[in-house]
A protein has these predicted regions:
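Acidic/histidine-rich catalytic neighborhood of metal-dependent amide-processing enzymes
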Residues: 105-175, 179, 379
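Midchain, well-structured core segments that form catalytic/ion-binding scaffolds
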Residues: 145-280, 289, 294
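Active-site metal-coordination/substrate-binding segment of hydrolases
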Residues: 63-131, 360
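Generic non-transmembrane alpha-helical segments
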Residues: 9-12, 16, 29, 33-37, ...
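N-terminal helical capping/dimerization or prosegment-like subdomains
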Residues: 1-77, 249-253, 360-362
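An extended, acidic, His-containing surface patch that forms the Zn2+-binding/catalytic region
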Residues: 224, 287-379
Length: 379
């Protein structure tokens, strides 16, 4: 495939506005492209207009199965007038292709698809199966990753590469993430007679104080050598009706980034114990809800998959971790374990930013590197 066509494919999928939805249009485009080159795909519907894409091909004797995965959704562009170049125009300036999803992660997804096409048409021998898993809803809960895992689509994998941006680093571990809500129920009263009511904001403040103390203690006591410490932040709070009334309803939301050494179930139990303790007070009525629960993940940094990748470079690539989550948080819940790594084009600090871009030489190089990795792993 010519260089210009590889770039044009990336431009086409960036121009599809798959903002927290509409992934079906991306899936249909990629499925048609793959079928044009003899690779048959399957659309797996999540909801109306939202389709995952599974595609695979095999060569030689039935050997190992190597998965390639990327998500098709992107986050909102924000204030589009703040962009130097329109976020869905996919303009090229110098060596940079600009657009929402250029780095996170349509360049990684396109590179994987093109690598499969070129490898199939090259006739180069290998033994095994290459399997694409293009997912919906990664940005808002790894929805497609969860769906495909529960449906058994990763049960045959021996290894998996997720093409999120890592800029020539190998991400083998990342933090988990928990979003929670605490609702405080109380009793309204006039602000001149606070003893006639139950001030729910004071109650939330007490929860924040206790939660911060417990989480700070946890962070100081347990640390992961790569990921660091557990991170806790209360990020949203709302309540009250007017300034001269004691509020009867308020709520807060918080986010926790977890590490393998103190997993999510223990953190959730800790939050529950704080709420239970406070609710022993006669005027307290706190209600805890876990809104989002993604586990931390860790792969073997000395796995055959990582060795195959390292062999494609003259200098060893750094092994890293990240605070952000990926579809690995769902895929690794499969009934069997498999090697995985996050490795794709783009700078890790650019996702969700204004003027997001990918370096074209990085994108084009990853197409070649993915092919070399496949041939090595499935030799």
């Amino acid at each position: 495939m010519k260089k210009e066509e590889k770039i044009a494919i990336l431009q086409e999928i960036i121009r599809i506005k798959s903002v927290n939805g509409n992934e079906g249009e991306v899936a249909a485009y990629l499925n048609k492209l793959l079928e044009k080159h003899g690779i048959i795909g399957e659309l797996v519907s999540y909801s109306n207009g939202r389709d995952n894409l599974i595609a695979q091909f095999q060569k030689g004797q039935s050997g190992k199965v190597l998965g390639l995965s990327g998500h098709m959704d992107v986050v909102a562009a924000g204030n589009e007038s703040s962009w130097t170049y329109a976020p869905f125009a996919a303009e090229i300036h110098g060596n940079r292709l600009y657009g929402r999803g250029a780095t996170d992660m349509k360049s990684g997804l396109a590179a994987m698809v093109i690598a499969m096409i070129e490898l199939k048409e090259s006739g180069k021998p290998f033994n095994g199966t290459v399997k694409l898993l293009a997912t919906v809803g990664e940005e808002v809960g790894e929805l497609g990753g969860e769906q495909l895992t529960k449906a058994g689509y990763v049960d045959d994998l021996d290894a998996l590469i997720i093409g999120e941006p890592t800029n020539y680093s190998l991400m083998y571990t990342h933090m988990g993430s928990i979003n929670y809500t605490v609702i405080s129920h109380g009793k309204e009263a006039h602000s001149s007679m606070p003893d006639q009511g139950y001030n729910v904001i004071n109650h939330l403040n007490e929860f924040i104080t206790k939660a911060n103390a417990e989480m700070n203690h946890l962070a100081e006591a347990i640390e992961n050598p790569v990921l660091g410490k557990t991170i806790h932040n209360v990020t949203l709070i709302s309540g009250g009706n007017q300034v001269n009334s004691i509020p009867s309803h308020a709520q807060l939301q918080g986010n926790i980034r977890s590490i393998p050494e103190y997993p999510n179930d223990k953190i959730i139990a800790l939050l529950q114990s704080i709420v239970k303790e406070l609710n022993q007070e006669t005027d307290y009525h706190l209600e805890l809800t876990i809104d989002y629960n993604k586990i931390p993940v860790k792969a073997d940094p000395d796995s055959p998959l990582i060795h195959c990748i390292q062999q494609q470079f003259s200098q060893p690539l750094p092994l890293v971790g990240a605070a952000a989550t990926t579809d690995a948080a769902e895929f690794t819940k499969a009934d069997h374990s498999f090697d995985f790594v996050v490795f794709g084009p783009g700078v890790v600090t650019l996702p969700h930013q204004i003027d997001e871009y990918v370096e074209l030489d990085n994108y084009l190089d990853m197409i070649e590197k993915y092919q070399a990795i496949i041939l090595s792993y499935l030799a």
